[in-house]
């Protein structure tokens, strides 16, 4: 047990009291991102080190690892605290998304350390999808680079509103204020093109030396702002899902015996109370909440983010993937949508392709109808393309095999975010964020000849493993 943890437990009056206090602290999920070798892993290591979150055995192991794999000479290589894969240590880079947990007296934190290399942009998008804040590291010697722009855009695309631009390695530019001011101006010029109302803050620091990370730097007296840790402890995170209407995707039908039938899942947004009238989509059947069951017992009310089991007053047909919402809410299922896509596969995404898509607990098939444009990350302009390559970001028009209850991603990431799954390998090949709904709802139905319909029926009957589309079903759906 480290010293600060032992002291905190003693101050709280024992382990049980300390654990209760931890439960009432707010939680901040953030990621570090930026270009290659900007010092992301070193910064996380410095945060853990300076907040005394490293145990004695970890510190001893870090000394040994620094001698074998370190890149800082006689100094501790704090990046090794996070770079856990052997390939990462041998190459001195981050490959996988590494998660670390720590807490201070004011807040709990979950950190996602994401790769800087362009070929691992998909890993970075994975890490950003659950975060509230992004720390964008910039090497003071290099300034704003393409990966800085790419990661900034992906972060905002995935709904992150709080950006902390950490201008690192200030020790290598003699802590000059003019270097900080120039990079700040360059980034603000670029950020004017980013979507949404963003909270952007700038901190000059040295992760290697510890300047302005957890303690104020004596080398940059010209900077009067907060340290990085102070920003993380005090930033006000207003989650949009708390203010959105109630959405409860059913993940599991819980029926341990004949006397109990509940619907388990995580409340995606809003709140739900015992006695509240709810509606089930896609069926539209209504009922009311009889019980809200949790691990700690029954509750009268549950809020967004809580894992609960809902018991209803009526026995109605509900299965995995259905969506529960307030009875007075209207959410029309859609078959067509425009989706912002981050593509993660070697094979490009092209019109005409079909994929399995998973949205909350729902899994269905979708067809790529068109690619409106790909985003040029360097200047955030739109350009016409025939396909979306690996790590490409663009807006895609899709048609689902069945109507889905969807929200716009910026309003509700759970019911507006989806993943693409290759139907042969079952590998996740892309991430999607709903931008527009029913964009092609007024498109006239496609007319198929009798021969085309008969051939389609024959293929579907005798070769079901081909997963051919039901043209007759498409015709009826469009009509």
Swiss-Prot record:
Listed CDD domains: CysN_ATPS, CysN_NodQ_II, CysN_NoDQ_III
Entries under Gene3D superfamilies matching the protein: P-loop containing nucleotide triphosphate hydrolases (3.40.50.300), Translation factors (2.40.30.10)
Origin: domain of life: Bacteria
Pfam families in UniProt: GTP-eEF1A_C (PF22594), GTP_EFTU (PF00009)
Residues that hold GTP according to the record: 34-41, 113-117, 168-171
Disulfide-bond pairs as recorded: none
Stretches the record annotates as G5: 206-208
Pathway terms, separated by semicolons: Sulfur metabolism; hydrogen sulfide biosynthesis; sulfite from sulfate: step 1/3
GO biological process: hydrogen sulfide biosynthetic process; sulfate assimilation
Swiss-Prot/TrEMBL keywords: ATP-binding, GTP-binding, Nucleotide-binding, Nucleotidyltransferase, Transferase
Catalytic activity entry: sulfate + ATP + H(+) = adenosine 5'-phosphosulfate + diphosphate
Chain's role: With CysD forms the ATP sulfurylase (ATPS) that catalyzes the adenylation of sulfate producing adenosine 5'-phosphosulfate (APS) and diphosphate, the first enzymatic step in sulfur assimilation pathway. APS synthesis involves the formation of a high-energy phosphoric-sulfuric acid anhydride bond driven by GTP hydrolysis by CysN coupled to ATP hydrolysis by CysD.
Name recorded for this polypeptide: Sulfate adenylyltransferase subunit 1
Organism, as annotated: Salmonella dublin (strain CT_02021853)
Lineage, top ranks: Bacteria, Pseudomonadati, Pseudomonadota, Gammaproteobacteria, Enterobacterales
């Amino acid at each position: 047990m480290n010293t600060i943890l032992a002291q905190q437990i003693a101050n709280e009056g024992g382990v049980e009291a300390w654990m209760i206090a931890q439960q009432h602290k707010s939680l901040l999920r953030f990621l570090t991102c930026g270009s290659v070798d900007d010092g992301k892993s070193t910064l996380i290591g410095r945060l853990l080190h300076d907040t005394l979150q490293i145990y004695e055995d970890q510190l001893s192991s870090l000394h040994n690892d620094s001698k074998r794999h370190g890149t800082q000479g006689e100094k501790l290589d704090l990046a090794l605290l996070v770079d856990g894969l052997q390939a990462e240590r041998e190459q001195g880079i981050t490959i996988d998304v590494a998660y670390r947990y720590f807490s201070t007296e004011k807040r709990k934190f979950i950190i996602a350390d994401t790769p800087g290399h362009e070929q691992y942009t998909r890993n970075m998008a994975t890490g950003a999808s659950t975060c509230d804040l992004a720390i964008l590291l910039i090497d003071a010697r290099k300034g704003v680079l393409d990966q800085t722009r790419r990661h900034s855009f992906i972060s905002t695309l995935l709904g992150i509103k709080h950006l902390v631009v950490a201008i690192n390695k200030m020790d290598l530019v003699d802590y000059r204020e003019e270097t900080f001011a120039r990079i700040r101006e360059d980034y603000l010029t670029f950020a004017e093109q980013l979507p949404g109302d963003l909270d952007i803050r700038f901190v000059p620091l040295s992760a290697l030396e510890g300047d302005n990370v957890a303690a104020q730097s004596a080398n940059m007296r010209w900077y009067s702002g907060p340290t990085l840790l102070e920003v993380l402890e005090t930033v006000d995170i207003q989650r949009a899902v708390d203010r959105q209407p109630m959405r409860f995707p059913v993940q599991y039908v819980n029926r341990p015996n004949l006397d109990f039938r509940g619907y388990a899942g995580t409340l995606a947004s809003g709140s739900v109370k015992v006695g509240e009238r709810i509606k089930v989509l896609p069926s539209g059947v209504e009922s009311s909440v009889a019980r809200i069951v949790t691990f700690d017992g029954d509750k009268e009310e549950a809020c967004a983010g809580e894992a609960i089991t809902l018991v209803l007053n009526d026995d109605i047909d509900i299965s995995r993937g259905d969506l529960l919402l307030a009875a007075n809410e209207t959410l029309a299922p859609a078959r067509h949508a425009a989706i912002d896509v981050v593509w993660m596969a070697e094979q490009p995404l092209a019109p005409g392709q079909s994929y399995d898509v998973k949205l909350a607990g729902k899994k269905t098939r979708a067809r790529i109808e068109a690619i409106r444009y790909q985003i040029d990350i360097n200047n955030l302009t739109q350009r016409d393309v025939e396909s979306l390559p690996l790590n490409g970001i663009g807006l895609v028009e899709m048609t689902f095999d069945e109507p889905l209850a969807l929200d716009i991603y910026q309003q509700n990431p759970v019911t507006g975010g989806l993943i693409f799954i290759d139907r042969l390998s079952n590998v996740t090949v892309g991430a999607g964020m709903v931008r527009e709904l029913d964009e092609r709802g007024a498109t006239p139905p496609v007319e198929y000849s009798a021969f085309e319909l008969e051939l389609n029926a024959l293929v579907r009957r005798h070769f079901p493993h081909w997963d051919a589309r039901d043209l007759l079903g498409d015709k009826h759906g469009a009509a």
